[in-house]
Amino acid sequence: IEEVGKTFDVPSGATVIDAGGKTVMPGLIDAHVHVCSNGDPNVMTMLTFPPGLIQLFGAYNAVKTLDAGYTMIRDMGAPSGYALSLKKAIEMGIAKGPRIIAPGRIISMTGGHADFYIPSGVSYNEMSLISDGPIETRRSTRINLREGADFIKICTTGGVMSPTDPVDTPQYTV
């Protein structure tokens, strides 16, 4: 929507929509999404997907989100900066989707909400930067900013998606 009103100059070639008798509203904003997710509540399922498939979930979800009326989303974490790459592709016009703000990788303590360690000893931390203490946390913040993060997401408590840290467990202190 460029302009709304009763009278104004319309540039030649512009599309004019007569919305008389209708309600016109701005696009919606979703403030907490994981755009590259396949929607499975078990986040560990993504461990079985090749990186390209995770990126394609992001592109697919971006189109569906825009088609649903959301013109901006705040992604809250995706593996390896995929949401930041998707954001750039949308800005360049090579992908369709809403405007995206994204944090890069989530910052979590060892064993914390975004530490995707598996009891077999395998660790999948493409989605997070494990940071214990202020020095490591500052370094992780700098890495995210270097990679283009719009904001920093730090898991300060446990969460509902992680098996070993209840939601009321403090994980960082000031």
Question: What would you call each of these model-derived segments?
Answer:
Residues 10, 79, 158:
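Flexible, active-site-proximal loop/turn residues at the rims of small-molecule/cofactor binding pockets
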